[in-house]
Structures are given as structure tokens and as C-alpha cells.
Amino acid sequence: MAKDIKFSADARSAMVRGVDILADTVKVTLGPKGRNVVLEKAFGSPLITNDGVTIAKEIELEDHFENMGAKLVSEVASKTNDIAGDGTTTATVLTQAIVREGLKNVTAGANPIGIRRGIETAVSAAVEELKEIAQPVSGKEAIAQVAAVSSRSEKVGEYISEAMERVGNDGVITIEESRGMETELEVVEGMQFDRGYLSQYMVTDNEKMVSELENPYILITDKKISNIQEILPLLEEVLKTNRPLLIIADDVDGEALPTLVLNKIRGTFNVVAVKAPGFGDRRKAMLEDIAILTGGTVVTEDLGLDLKDATMQVLGQSAKVTVDKDSTVIVEGAGDSSAIANRVAIIKSQMEATTSDFDREKLQERLAKLAGGVAVIKVGAATETELKEMKLRIEDALNATRAAVEEGIVSGGGTALVNVIEKVAALKLNGDEETGRNIVLRALEEPVRQIAYNAGYEGSVIIERLKQSEIGTGFNAANGEWVDMVTTGIIDPVKVTRSALQNAASVASLILTTEAVVANKPEPEAPTAPAMDPSMMGGF
């Protein structure tokens, strides 16, 4: 395929046109008075959203050179979303500001490499200062504030803070579509896996069709149990304690299952059997998780253990187990807290190492089950369009809240970026590196300027007053008042602000140091076939 090539100023200018088109589309959504953008969908109703990364991903430009610039900014938004889960619009605004200011200086003869070094030094100083002025987030109210700011809904803030309180910071919080109009929270505490009882005759509550075991022993094995003689010595030991037993095995069949059911019906023994969750290596890992949570040992050939030799020492324990036809929930396992903490640390390190989104999702699920449970926020709305928009907002809020708990919070509304200007301005740099620093100084003002503009105020006036105000005081664009941002609840997670600035500077520097751009030439359209002469159609 033939290529189209542009050099130097022509290359950069074409890319910057694409940057501007995308950024101008996205930045109208910034702040409490930000507008919405309507996205056409190939099927179904249009999507109305103010989520920066969702808008950025939809933009595809006809000009190949402009499209490359737009795609680079879209990459900034996506990367910021992946790291922090929010701040995508801020990242886009910062990228545009750095690129615009940088291009002016490069066109005027400045060295792009020197500018890049200055930008990197200034951003490092800004990030250090952000961490210095950060405040830790703890307590239900503080978490609710962060979530409410990101989602623009106090009710959503309450749901997220309650969910995090119930399942812990590492717990899984999923967002699903509700069948009704109302948004609601549902929490499953303890370790849940999608395997139900092997026989309905094992239920203890015939009305609800569930089996509830109080203070049970738990046998965990990756073997198939077909012969009751294999586990008979262990069953006799458990029977002496007068406590119920949960059996988690590869399968229970043959004579073993009817024997267990018969003893259950006669009232001799309260026992429930379920299949082991997962498949292959993931099954082994999940069984090990259950064993650590309950203080038991997996009976497996990998450890040289056999069912017929199993003793009471291999059994796990928990406060309660609930089993229905589809799922099993283990509540308050008796495992050692330090062993559970070690297991959690191992899973976290595996999550950082993996490059597969699917594997990361499965590891996150395992982490949640060990850490305390799963919460589901069921989103309700009057129309499908409103439902999609609400779901995106709640996802952003959840990610922002997790980021806030992890690294703390700073004043929101772009105020924190203006607060670090003094520290960045104090850097002693020379030549083009000083120019790079000045570019960052100008860019740090841009989010506040855009938020003010979207709300109908003059950004320059707001920024000048903000620079003279104490750290923490800022402009509430929602009502036009000057307030203590943190006290009022206008806050941003440090991780979000930091990621937006770092990713914006990284991609903007790449654009400024670009000297040639190679694009595919569009393929010429194939000529349309001429219509067939009617006289050649045989009179049909």
C-alpha cells in the first residue's frame, strides 16, 4: 500500500488539528456545568454522555494525519481511565494545552528535546507537590463525598460508600442494570461461588429450598468421590462432634451420593455436597483460597494426600454456610488472618503482573471473595438512554473512590493543579528546559479555565484570584461561590489528578518531538460495473 508522508511543521500541524478536534469535543463536558455529548450508535438509541474516554473512543477522523493526532489524545484518556478510572476529560484538556503552547515554541525555533526535558522535570515537581498536599480518605462520609462529586449524585455516593464499607476496599463492587426504575444496593457477604447442592434432598429449609449449616466442618478436595468407604472414617469422626459437614469435591456420584442423602433424610447426619468451583488451574487456585479462608487443607495428590487417610485436621470451618441450587456462600471462615493476608498479597501481585483483562477480572473476583464479599449496585432509570448514561457515571465514581482511598484526595475543580504552580515556578532551569517548564505552568491553569468557561465565567479572573487565595480555597462553579473545597466536598483523588497530568505530558511531548508522520494513502474506489445491455439478456 502506498504511503503519504509529511515532515516537520506540516506533520505536527496536521496532528495538532486532530488533537484540537477531539479535545474541543471532550472538554465541553468538564465541571459541574459541563454539557453532554450525543454519540450516534449503529444500532439502538444514541448514547448521551459526559464521560471523556467514551467520547474520545468514538471519534474517527477522515484525514489520516489528523486522525493520528486524535488517536494519541484518545490514548491519553484511555490510559488515565485504566490507571485511575476517572480524570479522562482533565487529561484531554491538559494534553491540548501542552501541545498548543509547545507547538508555538517549537515553531519559533526552540529545541523539542530541551522542551521535553523541561516538561518532564516540571511534571515530576508538580506530582511531588500534589502528594505533599494530599489528605487521606477514611470514614464512610469522606468516601461518600468523593463518589458523589464524581457521579454528581449524593444518592450514588451513599451507595458506593456503603458498598465499600460492607465488602472492604478490595471487595468486588459490580454495576448491573436493574429491572425497575430505582437504583438499589445488594450485598453478598462472605465467599460465594456458583455451585449449588448436588441433591435437593440436602436442603434444610423446604420453603426457601436452601440448606443452612451453622458452624460446619468443610471438606475440600479436587477428587471425585464415588465410593463412600473412602470418606467413611472421616464421616464417623465428624458425626461424633454433632456438627454439620459441607463437602466440596470434583464430583460426588456412584453409591456415595445416595448414601449421604439417605443419612441426611434419616436425620443421622446433616451434610451437603457441592461441586468444586472453576476449571483447570483456576479450580486449584480457588480450592486453595477456600482452604486458606476456612483454615483447612485441600485433599489433593499434589500434596500427597488421599481421602481415605484424611483426618479432622484437614477440615476447614466457618460460622455459617448457605447453599441453594445455584450457589454456595461461606461466611466468617476460621482461617488464620495472617495466612489470608499473605494470600491476598499474592493475588494482588499476580494482578499487577498479568496482561490479560480476563485474568485480571478473575483475580479481582478471587481477591474480593477472600477480602469479604461482593456488592452489586443495580442501576434503574426511566429510559435505556438514561440508564446507559447513569451506568457510566457510577462506574467513574466507583473508580474515583477507589483511587481516593488508595492515594488520598486534593481540592477538586482543578484547584489542586493551580496550587502546585508556585512549586513548579520555583524550579531553576535554563534555555529550552525553562520553556518546557513555562508550558506546564500555563497548562496547569487550563482545567480551571475550562470549568469556569463551561459555567459561564471568565477563567482568567478566576485563576488570578485563586493564585492569591489560601491552599484549599477554590471556586465552586456550580453556584459561583468561593469556598473551602474539601469541607464543601469538592474533591479529586490524587491518583486521578496525578495520572491525568503524567499521561498528558507524556503524549504531548511525543507529539512535539515528532519530525515525520507516515500515513496510508486512501485506496482508490473501484469503478462501478457498467449496466448490462438488455439485448444481451436473451429477451428475459
UniProtKB/Swiss-Prot annotation:
GO molecular function terms attached to this record: ATP binding; ATP-dependent protein folding chaperone; isomerase activity; unfolded protein binding
Database matches in PROSITE patterns: CHAPERONINS_CPN60
UniProt cross-references to SUPFAM superfamilies, sorted A to Z: GroEL apical domain-like (SSF52029), GroEL equatorial domain-like (SSF48592), GroEL-intermediate domain like (SSF54849)
Gene3D superfamilies to which the protein is assigned, alphabetical: GroEL (3.50.7.10), GroEL-like equatorial domain (1.10.560.10), TCP-1-like chaperonin intermediate domain (3.30.260.10)
Pfam families the UniProt entry points to: Cpn60_TCP1 (PF00118)
Protein EC: 5.6.1.7
Entry annotated with the keyword Cell cycle: no
A GO CC term assigned to this protein in UniProt: cytoplasm
Domain of life: Bacteria
Record keywords: ATP-binding, Chaperone, Cytoplasm, Isomerase, Nucleotide-binding
Protein's GO biological process: protein refolding
Predominant cellular place of this UniProt entry's protein: cytoplasm
Subcellular location per the Swiss-Prot or TrEMBL entry: Cytoplasm
Enzyme class: isomerase
Stored InterPro entries: Chaperonin_Cpn60_CS, Cpn60/GroEL, Cpn60/GroEL/TCP-1, GroEL-like_apical_dom_sf, GROEL-like_equatorial_sf, TCP-1-like_intermed_sf
List of residues binding ATP: T29, L30, G31, P32, D86, G87, T88, T89, T90, G413, N476, A477, A478, D492
Disulfide bridge map: none
Catalytic activity: ATP + H2O + a folded polypeptide = ADP + phosphate + an unfolded polypeptide
Quaternary data: Forms a cylinder of 14 subunits composed of two heptameric rings stacked back-to-back. Interacts with the co-chaperonin GroES.
Functional summary from the UniProt entry: Together with its co-chaperonin GroES, plays an essential role in assisting protein folding. The GroEL-GroES system forms a nano-cage that allows encapsulation of the non-native substrate proteins and provides a physical environment optimized to promote and accelerate protein folding.
Family: Belongs to the chaperonin (HSP60) family.
PANTHER family, per the entry: 60 KDA HEAT SHOCK PROTEIN, MITOCHONDRIAL
Protein name per the record: Chaperonin GroEL
Species of provenance: Streptococcus agalactiae serotype V (strain ATCC BAA-611 / 2603 V/R)
